[in-house]
């Protein structure tokens, strides 16, 4: 970016602060960053959790990787540079949503550890919870809801994570969920995490 142009940009402070929004909402804001292979259950778990939050009057929003790539990041390929840019853009959007007082659920493969760490640093460690959906690739491939593994195996698509490209599992995720566990059990764990971090009041989903 042109330095002269950058020097003429000034951050506009909002009269309504994040703290005021959180107080009105009755809960704090945070990011749950769901990472895992395609077909691991990221979006399914995030959707199920969002339904619970919504029914309990908690303001949340789910950002799905495919949805973002269909609009905001439709100009990006799956090269390493573009994958990094994709994650950076998502991080910038999430940063604004944090200040809106929301609980943001991000479902995106984000295959590289440095990508996820970049977002953690961008948002601040206290605002970011890395949720690793640990599902064996054999199960992900057997599910294959979008038929992407099949296309990758036959060479119809390239640069597919888990086949042609590496997925780097988190060394120490904030939350570890088994993609083979039930939606209810995984959601209970996430609700407990949010409660233990003083983000929300306790929710009983039994």
UniProtKB/Swiss-Prot annotation:
GO terms of molecular function: adenylylsulfate kinase activity; ATP binding
InterPro entries: APS_kinase (IPR002891), P-loop_NTPase (IPR027417)
Pathway: Sulfur metabolism; hydrogen sulfide biosynthesis; sulfite from sulfate: step 2/3
Listed GO biological process terms: hydrogen sulfide biosynthetic process; sulfate assimilation
Pfam families (UniProt xref): APS_kinase
Reactions that this protein is recorded to catalyse: adenosine 5'-phosphosulfate + ATP = 3'-phosphoadenylyl sulfate + ADP + H(+)
The keyword ATP-binding appears for this protein: yes
Annotated positions binding ATP: 36-43
Active-site residues per Swiss-Prot or TrEMBL entry: 110
EC number from the UniProt entry: 2.7.1.25
Keywords linked to the UniProt accession: ATP-binding, Kinase, Nucleotide-binding, Phosphoprotein, Transferase
Record-linked CDD domains: APSK
Enzyme class: transferase
HAMAP family per the UniProt record, alphabetical: Adenylyl_sulf_kinase (MF_00065)
Similarity field: Belongs to the APS kinase family.
Function: Catalyzes the synthesis of activated sulfate.
Name assigned to this protein: Adenylyl-sulfate kinase
Native source organism of the sequence: Buchnera aphidicola subsp. Acyrthosiphon pisum (strain APS) (Acyrthosiphon pisum symbiotic bacterium)
Gene that encodes the chain: cysC
């Amino acid at each position: 970016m042109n330095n002269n142009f950058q020097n003429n940009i000034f951050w506009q402070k909002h009269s309504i602060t994040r703290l005021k929004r959180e107080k009105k909402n009755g809960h704090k804001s945070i990011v749950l960053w769901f990472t895992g292979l395609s077909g691991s259950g990221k979006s399914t778990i995030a959707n199920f959790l969002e339904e619970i939050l919504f029914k309990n009057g908690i303001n949340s929003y789910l950002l799905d990787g495919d949805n973002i790539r269909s609009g905001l990041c439709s100009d990006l390929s799956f090269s390493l540079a573009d994958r990094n840019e994709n994650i950076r853009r998502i991080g910038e959007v999430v940063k604004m949503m944090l200040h809106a007082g929301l609980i943001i659920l991000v479902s995106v493969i984000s295959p590289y550890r440095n990508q996820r760490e970049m977002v953690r640093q961008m948002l601040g460690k206290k605002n970011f919870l890395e949720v690793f959906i640990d599902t064996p690739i054999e199960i992900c491939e057997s599910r294959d809801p979008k038929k992407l593994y099949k296309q990758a195996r036959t060479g119809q698509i390239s640069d597919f994570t888990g086949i042609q490209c590496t997925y780097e599992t988190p060394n120490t995720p904030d939350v570890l969920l088994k993609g083979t566990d039930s939606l209810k059990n995984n959601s209970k764990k996430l609700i407990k995490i949010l409660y233990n971090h003083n983000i929300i009041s306790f929710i009983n989903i039994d």
